[in-house]
């Protein structure tokens, strides 16, 4: 016979306490078996508050707690069950976890003891209380023996194998003044991230970081009219950030929110960000979700997201405005001088002449140099910085049919003059009707 089989009720049977006890076990097993498969990690705290005053005396005590034990037993302290006796932590306990425990049900073991008896392996303490008849028209009360759950605070030295236990806190040490030092990084198993303040705080922090990055990206996308690969990358990243911000905002307001649901979204987001921020464009191997060790599960993912959102993603292609001056001179001023050493420069030329003619004659009719030396290059007929025709438009900048693309020769002797210059100058000597110039810097 199974200890959890249902009772076969029949008319005229002589009822004994064993019938109801067996029926209770059957119902509890039925509910546990039906619910256990619905959610992995279906145990932990929904609420947890410790007594801070007793910590200074070397004791750990629970003020209030609500949740579910690993065996499926729900608890609500102190509303339904009394808080366990405070645990006087020994000085020898270092980096040890304190657990909230309840003895497991075992065949042949006494399940309930009377108030005042030694607990032994009992799960319940019987107390007689006056209970009102809810269906009576007048006040009608009767004494009823009620069993409250007999919780204990335990450490691993107490033999956790006989208990349904859930971690409460990790004690770093008991200091010389007898006060307990708790590990602030420890996260107990929870059913709602509200019971684990570091997780709830990170959800709000992430929402703020995503909003800031989204605003910066949106401003850059709106201000840009490039249409090249760089802007497409910004659009894709903005799409990712917008989706993540909306989802994170939703999750930060949902209660209860199981940590596994939060982890699933965070690890997916961290993997997506690697496409834009990781040098190999691939995510690292993140830890498998462990409900009994939330800190080890979340810490690497939280770090990866902070790093991804702190990374400055510069535009690969930067449009540099060209201003037409007198005597065929066009000037492009540089606001970021680091581009001289870290970027290649492309001049895009469009005119109402055949493309092959433009490709062959424009480099001969144009002189390129620094704004300070362009006059000398023209007057002394010096070559300046060479223009190298490009077979195709670089993928980082927009392609326009009919335009010809020239790369500035960084190997030119005049290139060093740009180090201390305000920008580039272009002198166009020939006649090119409908001439239109665009200038781009492409980061290496």
UniProtKB/Swiss-Prot annotation:
Disruption phenotype: Deletion mutant shows a severely reduced secretion of VgrG1a, VgrG1c as well as Hcp1. It holds the Pfam family T6SS_VasE. Core component of the H1 type VI (H1-T6SS) secretion system that plays a role in the release of toxins targeting both eukaryotic and prokaryotic species. Functions as a spatio-temporal marker for assembly of contractile apparatus made of TssB1 and TssC1. This role in assembly depends on TssM1. Forms transient higher-order structures that correlated with dynamics of sheath component TssB1. Interacts with TssA1. PANTHER family: BLR3599 PROTEIN (PTHR35566), TYPE VI SECRETION SYSTEM BASEPLATE COMPONENT TSSK1 (PTHR35566:SF1). NCBIfam families: VI_chp_4. This is Type VI secretion system baseplate component TssK1. It comes from Pseudomonas aeruginosa (strain ATCC 15692 / DSM 22644 / CIP 104116 / JCM 14847 / LMG 12228 / 1C / PRS 101 / PAO1).
């Amino acid at each position: 016979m199974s200890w959890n089989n249902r009772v076969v009720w029949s008319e005229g049977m002589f009822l004994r306490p064993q019938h109801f006890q067996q029926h209770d076990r059957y119902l509890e097993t039925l509910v546990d078996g039906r619910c256990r498969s619905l959610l992995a990690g279906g145990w932990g705290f929904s609420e947890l508050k410790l007594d801070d005053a007793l910590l200074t005396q070397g004791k750990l005590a629970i003020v209030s707690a609500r949740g579910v034990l690993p065996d499926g037993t729900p608890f609500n302290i102190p509303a339904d069950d009394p808080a366990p006796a405070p645990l006087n932590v020994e000085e020898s306990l270092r980096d040890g976890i304190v657990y909230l425990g309840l003895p497991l049900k075992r065949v042949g073991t006494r399940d309930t003891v009377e108030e005042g008896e030694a607990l032994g392996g009992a799960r319940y303490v019987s107390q007689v209380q006056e209970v009102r008849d809810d269906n009576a028209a007048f006040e009608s009360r009767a004494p009823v023996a009620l069993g409250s759950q007999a919780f204990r605070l335990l450490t691993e030295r107490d033999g956790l194998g006989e208990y349904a236990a859930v971690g409460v806190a990790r004690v770093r040490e008991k200091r010389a003044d007898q006060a307990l030092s708790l590990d602030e990084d420890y996260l107990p198993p929870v059913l709602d991230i509200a019971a684990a303040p570091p997780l709830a705080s990170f959800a709000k922090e992430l929402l703020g970081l995503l909003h800031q990055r989204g605003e910066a990206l949106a401003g850059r996308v709106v201000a840009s009219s490039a249409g090249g690969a760089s802007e497409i990358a910004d659009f894709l990243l903005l799409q990712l950030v917008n989706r993540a911000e909306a989802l994170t905002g939703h999750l930060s307001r949902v209660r209860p929110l199981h940590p596994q649901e939060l982890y699933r979204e965070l690890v997916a987001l961290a993997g997506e960000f690697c496409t834009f921020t990781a040098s190999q464009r691939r995510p690292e191997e993140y830890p498998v979700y462990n409900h009994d060790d939330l800190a080890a599960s979340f810490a690497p993912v939280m770090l990866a997201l902070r790093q991804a959102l702190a990374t400055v993603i510069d535009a690969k292609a930067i449009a540099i405005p060209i201003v037409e001056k007198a005597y065929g001179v066009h000037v492009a001023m540089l606001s970021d001088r680091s581009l001289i050493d870290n970027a290649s420069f492309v001049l895009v030329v469009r005119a109402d002449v055949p493309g092959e003619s433009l490709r062959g004659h424009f480099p001969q009719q144009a002189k390129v140099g620094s704004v300070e030396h362009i006059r000398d290059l023209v007057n002394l007929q010096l070559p300046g910085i060479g223009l190298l025709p490009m077979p195709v438009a670089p993928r980082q900048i927009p392609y326009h049919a009919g335009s010809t693309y020239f790369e500035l020769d960084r190997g030119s002797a005049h290139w060093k003059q740009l180090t201390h210059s305000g920008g580039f100058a272009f002198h166009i000597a020939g006649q090119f009707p409908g001439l239109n110039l665009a200038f781009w810097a492409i980061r290496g």
